[in-house]
């Protein structure tokens, strides 16, 4: 097992804590695991040539996620 430690600004820690409250996540480890799961899914989708977006079903609109790390993803699925 590897221990990972992060130094974050106070404001970012407040944002993380608010996300945890909103989603009923109890530990920062669980928050990290959820974030990692979502990121892995996004990378796999980008490798498959898909667009990552949020869809507003009521207004029939969508908004593409723009994230520099995902712009670097190309090629076949390997996850």
PLM-predicted stretches and their roles:
Residues 56-59:
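Short acidic-glycine loop/turn motifs at beta-strand connectors
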Residues 77-79:
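Non-DNA-binding regulatory cores of transcription-related proteins
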Residues 28-48, 61-64:
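Short, basic amphipathic alpha-helical segments that act as recognition/interaction helices
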Residues 10-27, 45, 53:
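Surface-exposed, Lys/Arg-rich phosphate-binding patches that contact polyanionic backbones
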Residues 5, 49-51:
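Residues at or immediately flanking beta-strands
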Residues 1-7, 20, 62-69, 74-75:
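Short Lys/Arg-rich basic patches
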Residues 6-8, 16-19, 31, 36:
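Generic leucine side-chain signal with a strong bias for well-ordered alpha-helical environments
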């Amino acid at each position: 097992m590897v221990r990972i430690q992060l130094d974050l600004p106070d404001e970012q820690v407040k944002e993380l804590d608010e996300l945890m409250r909103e989603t009923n996540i109890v530990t920062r480890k669980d928050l990290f695991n959820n974030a990692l799961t979502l990121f892995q899914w996004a990378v796999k989708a980008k490798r498959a040539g898909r667009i990552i977006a949020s869809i507003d079903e009521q207004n029939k609109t969508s908004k593409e996620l723009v994230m520099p790390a995902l712009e670097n993803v190309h090629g076949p699925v390997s996850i």
